[in-house]
Amino acid sequence: MKKINKIKIKLNGKYIKIQDRITLFNLTKKFKVPINKVAIELNQVIVNKKSLDKIKVKKNDKIEIVHFIGGG
C-alpha cells in the first residue's frame, strides 16, 4: 500500500496537515467550500477560480478563503 505524504500549510490562520500535491480545487472540495461564494488567496495573491484545478498546494503555503456575505 502506498503511503500518502502529508504537508503542513496555513489555512485561514491555522496550521493543518494535508495530502502533498493536492490541488486548490480538491482542497476546497475536501472542506466543502462553495467556490462560487468565496475568494481564495494563496500566499497573498488572489487566485483565479479557473486555475484552481491546476495549482498544487506546497509545503508552508498560506491560504485564505474569504466568504462573501451579502448585505444592504
How would you label these PLM feature ranges?
Residues 1-71:
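Ubiquitin-like/PB1-type beta-grasp interaction modules and other compact soluble beta-rich domains
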